[in-house]
Swiss-Prot record:
GO CC field: ATP-binding cassette (ABC) transporter complex
Primary role: ATP-binding (A) component of a common energy-coupling factor (ECF) ABC-transporter complex. Unlike classic ABC transporters this ECF transporter provides the energy necessary to transport a number of different substrates.
Oligomeric and partner information: Forms a stable energy-coupling factor (ECF) transporter complex composed of 2 membrane-embedded substrate-binding proteins (S component), 2 ATP-binding proteins (A component) and 2 transmembrane proteins (T component).
Highest taxon in the source lineage: Bacteria
PROSITE patterns for this protein: ABC_TRANSPORTER_1, ABC_TRANSPORTER_2, CBIO
Keywords: ATP-binding, Cell membrane, Membrane, Nucleotide-binding, Translocase, Transport
Protein name: Energy-coupling factor transporter ATP-binding protein EcfA2
Family of this protein: Belongs to the ABC transporter superfamily. Energy-coupling factor EcfA family.
Amino acid sequence: MIIRFDNVSYTYQKGTPYQHQAIHDVNTEFEQGKYYAIVGQTGSGKSTLIQNINALLKPTTGTVTVDDITITHKTKDKYIRPVRKRIGMVFQFPESQLFEDTVEREMIFGPKNFKMNLDEAKNYAHRLLMDLGFSRDVMSQSPFQMSGGQMRKIAIVSILAMNPDIIVVDEPTAGLDPQSKRQVMRLLKSLQTDENKTIILISHDMNEVARYADEVIVMKEGSIVSQTSPKELFKDKEKLADWHIGLPEIVQLQYDFEQKHQTKLKDIALTEEAFVSLYKEWQHEK
């Protein structure tokens, strides 16, 4: 499943004194099975971009193509329904949208609306919940008797229960404790590597971006100013400063190390494990 943006612009409240163009002339493509991160300052157009992916917003100009379905500002909702079934959207603080009295009912709400096999959806959701550290009897429990972090994970899995091909998540770990953050991010990565799902992550956490993403899209003032690998992105400190994007902690550590020892390691480390490997290699060659 490929998503392509061709010259996409979106204007809020068009034709009024309050109109605001949130994204303009966006051209990009999301390939099946890759992990994308979208980064940029607040107001750079990230959320507007992802809402155009499954036509929660329709382009003011330009086209969004999802496989063989082309979406314009004129496309009727009945033609978009197959797209929405295949793209799971998890917005910020999704726990605020929970409303069913048991986890099981929460899990089958989306699949029921799309007339999916409910037993398959329940089994799939239960497996994902177990991966996130829940007990076996979680399906009979009330989400409203759980902690905020548990409710967040329940809300995320309620979207994943529809088994979408593309998973779009907006700051999914904001406010979570470190263990829950790791659980959520590892689950998303496993869905990419084990089930060939496309992950599109909005995040301000460059540590997450460095560790998990295959490709990073940088947005500034409604435009894409860069689309590259994490390693290439974090090489250019001047551009990062101009875009107001910080360095991951491990990359900053590497730059500090190189400055202190007046050396240059052979590669940029995006994880602690990679840095240790580069450090050992440097020691061996010293």
